Structure formats: structure tokens, C-alpha cells
Amino acid sequence: MQESGGSSGQGGPSLCLEWKQLNYYVPDQEQSNYSFWNECRKKRELRILQDASGHMKTGDLIAILGGSGAGKTTLLAAISQRLRGNLTGDVVLNGMAMERHQMTRISSFLPQFEINVKTFTAYEHLYFMSHFKMHRRTTKAEKRQRVADLLLAVGLRDAAHTRIQQLSGGERKRLSLAEELITDPIFLFCDEPTTGLDSFSAYSVIKTLRHLCTRRRIAKHSLNQVYGEDSFETPSGESSASGSGSKSIEMEVVAESHESLLQTMRELPALGVLSNSPNGTHKKAAICSIHQPTSDIFELFTHIILMDGGRIVYQGRTEQAAKFFTDLGYELPLNCNPADFYLKTLADKEGKENAGAVLRAKYEHETDGLYSGSWLLARSYSGDYLKHVQNFKKIRWIYQVYLLMVRFMTEDLRNIRSGLIAFGFFMITAVTLSLMYSGIGGLTQRTVQDVGGSIFMLSNEMIFTFSYGVTYIFPAALPIIRREVGEGTYSLSAYYVALVLSFVPVAFFKGYVFLSVIYASIYYTRGFLLYLSMGFLMSLSAVAAVGYGVFLSSLFESDKMASECAAPFDLIFLIFGGTYMNVDTVPGLKYLSLFFYSNEALMYKFWIDIDNIDCPVNEDHPCIKTGVEVLQQGSYRNADYTYWLDCFSLVVVAVIFHIVSFGLVRRYIHRSGYY
């Protein structure tokens, strides 16, 4: 393994990432059926990684092989520092210790399953992510150029305007790879990049990685080369004229050993280097966990790592692995896939006891003292490199909020059909309530009860519609939030604020539309100002309900659990809302209810100016003569500030719900890794 000390041949020393004595522990999942006993019993830990040590240098394409549960993904996440929890050991770059934030700047992690917004096109997704992943001073033209290079480099030219949900599995995998290449990282970590792909797509993905690791040509491509010769309008409205300054694309000749498989495949061009990237003088290095690769794919890897039981039992060049096994008496059969042979040998009881132990001992012996001599001389170089990387400046927080709001609204527009269906049912409810209470007329004793019932239904419908409409949000979005926030794409606070703000215009629109249908048949005699004030209050109730719904959503990682646990909260809020019981009997508790603030403000606005209510001739029945008496009967306040105090209270309740919800989501995000 003396090769590690060499130069990259690209204008500077090689960058080498070394991991030393990595150990990872997780709690034992074996539990008793009795929760009390689970709390009292001593917690045990399982050791997932055991003294894992190794290295990778620029130019390497490494495959991590092992059976199920061998620790492949855990090792990948530990090296890339995307793993949280009880992890011990060191990760160093040319002998210098690496912090988590430094690692995320010089590396990218390609997850096993694609995590992105499915309603975006391939171009839109990459262009959107370029705003977050490129330096804040990068111009829009440079971002569009980078996206053009990426789409061509990963072979997605013809799918640039296709929505992600319509792409094939191989295309989605290559799009995910293109996203990770936006920052021009030195190290690529790929978790089973061929899973779920056919042999051709799997080969093309690994071949793309081989290109990135073995070449560093600068190849700039015009937008016309990516999107065709026709004029293409960019998101900013600019048009790329046909044939203006287009450069020919250099294509690589397919290796003879794979001509039969790829005879129709045009080779992918090398990717251009970012103008402000410190990585331009380096090859890349990629390390992939991979499950049962074909022989064609296996031959693309320059090195392999074999794992068994959380231990590394071999690391070395791909072509040298057969000799190691042969020396131990395990001859590689003719016409046999080497990867299958190695895994079968390790899985065999005899091979697991003999070959695994001997290979592990040999590996530990050869890696002892690996980073002495020339690598120590490269420390100052890697230090300068890290300083350059740390000069990266992300876009400002307020711009993150703006871009995320654009993404949320774009998703809603792309899913307009389901949105219209939901809005249709919402309006059916409004029409139904309007027909039920359309007989209200005059100011009589009957009107008091009917108006109270209609206002109660208005409040209920707005709160329940918006609270239950958002309970699914965080359980569905946690994977993408955990990954993008963990990678430093944007801050969690920016995501949360953008999410909340995106609901505000919807709340006001639906609040006034819903009230319009009912107001036209029930309250029209009271004037336009009452309509405006009631609509504003209903909209605030919807905003507060969003906070309540998001709170329920953040309590659990399952939307089903969130919906089921909402029932006791709903019951408490309804009881203390002022309709089902006299809230004066439980002073103080009424202020916990959203329904109380909403009902009180709506009732106040309707009744406070009413000075005369008709009484029946029969004096044996109680008679309410003024609007103030109506409010007093319902235990509602009648002071001049009541309406605005309730509006302010709804805002405060919403803020409290959001603060608690943000804390819960933050706990979920930082509790586990983002890989």
C-alpha cells in the first residue's frame, strides 16, 4: 500500500482520508413487554463497528463488500461523519483531524434512496439546490452553467425537463449524484448506488463515478449542448441562442472489455471544475457500499474493502484480492464473479473463522504506520486546503426562507388537482352550513341560539380543517429535512419559518372565502365591516390551528399516531371553548383553548353593538334584551379591547405551539444521522 503516498499528478499532493479505530455502539433493541421493567433494567449496547481502520486517496474508487448486517452503511456513515451517537475513533485528512462541518464541505453523501422533491424537473431541482450549495457570490449565469455541465456529465440531457417522479430509477440515481456534485466535492460516499437498478443503469452509475475519480478535465458546455439546438428559456427568462459558441464535447472510448454491454451508450464527458472551487487540481475519491455487484461493475472499482461482523477483514487493490484468497487456500474458480466468491467465502463458517481472521491480521499489519514520512510533509498543504474550503459563504438566512417558500408553493401548484379536490370539499361544507342556518332572521330569542351555533361551527370548521390538514407534514418530510439540514444545505429555522409563512396566505384566502358563502345568507344585514373583522379573526384562527396541527405532527414520526393522539387535545379544547360548559366554573383553563378565543371574538363582534332583542309575550320564559347580556350568558368578556385581545392571544398561542414544535423537530433531526 505504498501507493498512498504518491502525488496526484494534478498539480499538488494527493489528499488522503484515513479513519482509525472506529467503533460504533447502539442500544440493544431487545425489550420487555413491560415499559416499567425496560426503564429499570440496565441498558446494554451492541457494537456495530469494531476497530475499523483504513484509508482512501484521490483517484480511488472503493467498494465496500459484505453480507447483510456486516456494517457497510454504518462504516460509510462513520467515515463521512454523517453518523450520530456513540462513535469513537479518528478521521483525519493527510494527518489532520477532521471536524464534522469540515467533512461536509469537502465531501458528499449519496443515500441509498433518493430524497428530493418529486414535482420538480431535473433542471429545476439542480438549479434550486445550486443556490444553497454554491457560494453566495456566484452569479445566476454561473449556476446555470454548472447545472448544464452536471446534466450532461451524468447523461440527463434528454431528461432535463422531465419531472423527477417520472424518471427511471437509474435516472433518479444519476440526478442524485449530480446534486452531490454541485459543490465539486473531493470525496464521494455512496450507499448502495446500484440498488433497484437494472444492469445497464447500475453500470452507467458506477462508470460515471469512475470518470470522476480518474479524470479532471475542464469541460465547459453551453446550455444548447445540454438542452438541444433549439432556443432554451432559463428560469430567469433569458434565452440561449442556438449554436452560439457551442464547443464540441470530447467523448471517451469505451473499454474493450465492456463494448458488448455498452455498444449503444455514448460515454459521458468529464465534469467542469467550479471557477471558485479549491478542488480543481484534484481527482476525486469515491467509496461505495454495494450489494452483489456484477463482474462488469466489480472490475470498475480500483480497491475493495471486505467487511464481516463490523470488522474490516481486507482492504487493497481489486486485482490483488484474488491472490490474498489464493494464498489462504481459497482458489477463485474460472468464470466466477469475484465479488460473489469473496462474500460466499466469508459467509462460510470455515472461511469466517480462518480466512476472515488471517485477512484481518494481514490488513492490520500492512496499515500499521501507513501515514508516516511523505504524508506528514503534506499536512501543511491539507491545512491550507481546509482554510480555503472554510471561506465558503452560504446564502443569507432570509434568502433561504424565500427560496424554501418558493419550493413549497411550487409543490402546491404542481399538485393543484389534489388541492382543488380538497378545496371543493371545503366549499361543500360552507354551502351546507349556509343552507342549515339560512333561516336566521331578525333579532329574536331564537336568533341568539342560532347565531351562537353558526359561529361555533365557523370556528370549529376553520380550526379542524387547518390543524388536521398539516398533521402529515413532518412525518413525511423528516427524511428530507434531516438530510438537507444535516448536510448544511439550509438551516432548520429557515425551513420552519418558510413552512409557516407559506400557510399564511392560504389561511386568509380560505378564511374569507368560507365566511363569504355563509355571510351572504346569514349575516348580510350587519354590513361589510363586520364581514372584514369576522374574516380576519377566522383567518387568525386558521393560522393558530396550523400551529396546533404542526405541534401534533412533530410529536411523533408517524402521521397515524399524530392523528390518533389528537383526540384528547381536541376534547379538552372543545370543552373549554365556551359552548359545552360555562367556562367560569373552570377559570384559567379556558385560556388554553383555541376555540375560546375564536368563539369569544366572533361573538363579541356580532353582539356588542346590539341594544335591543325582541322578547316573547310569555313573560315566564327568560329574556335576553341586549348583546351584552348574550356575551355575559356565555361567560364572554365585553370590554372594548376584547376583540383585539383575542386576536393577539391567538397569535401568542400559535407562537407557543411553533416554538414547542420546532424544539421537537430539532430533537428528531439531531437524534440520528443523516445518511
From Swiss-Prot:
Bias type Low complexity, positions: 236-248
Disruption phenotype: Eyes are brown due to a defect in red pigment production. In Malpighian tubules, guanine uptake is impaired. Reduces the levels of several metabolites, including kynurenine, kynurenic acid, 3-hydroxykynurenine, guanosine, xanthine, urate, riboflavin, and tetrahydrofolate, and increases the levels of guanine. In the head, levels of neurotransmitters histamine, dopamine and serotonin are reduced; specifically, histamine is reduced in the retina. Severe loss of white protein in the retina lamina and photoreceptors.
Segments forming domain ABC transporter: 34-261
Cytoplasmic side: 1-419, 482-497, 553-568, 666-675
Record note on what altering G578D does: In T50; normal eye color. Eyes are brown due to a reduction in red pigment production in a w/white co2 mutant background
Pfam families per record: ABC2_membrane, ABC2_membrane_7, ABC_tran
GO CC terms, sorted: plasma membrane; presynapse
Topological type in the membrane: Multi-pass membrane protein
Enzyme class, first EC level, given as a word: translocase
Binding-site list for ATP: G66, G67, S68, G69, A70, G71, K72, T73
Residues covered by region (Disordered): 229-249
Catalytic activity: guanine(out) + ATP + H2O = guanine(in) + ADP + phosphate + H(+); riboflavin(in) + ATP + H2O = riboflavin(out) + ADP + phosphate + H(+); (6S)-5,6,7,8-tetrahydrofolate(out) + ATP + H2O = (6S)-5,6,7,8-tetrahydrofolate(in) + ADP + phosphate + H(+)
Transmembrane spans: 420-440, 461-481, 498-518, 532-552, 569-589, 645-665
Keywords from the UniProt entry: ATP-binding, Membrane, Nucleotide-binding, Pigment, Translocase, Transmembrane, Transmembrane helix, Transport
Subcellular locations according to the entry: Membrane
Alphabetical GO biological process terms: aminergic neurotransmitter loading into synaptic vesicle; eye pigment precursor transport; guanine transport; sensory perception of sound; transmembrane transport
Induction line: Up-regulated during aging in intestinal stem cells.
Extracellular side: 441-460, 519-531, 590-644
Record's signal peptide: none
EC number: 7.6.2.-, 7.6.2.6
First-listed, main subcellular location of the protein, grouped into a coarse class: membrane
Molecular function per GO: ABC-type transporter activity; amine transmembrane transporter activity; ATP binding; ATP hydrolysis activity; ATPase-coupled transmembrane transporter activity; guanine transmembrane transporter activity; pigment binding
Subunit structure: May form a heterodimer with w/white.
Protein name, as recorded: Protein brown
Native source organism of the sequence: Drosophila melanogaster
Encoding gene, per UniProt annotation: bw
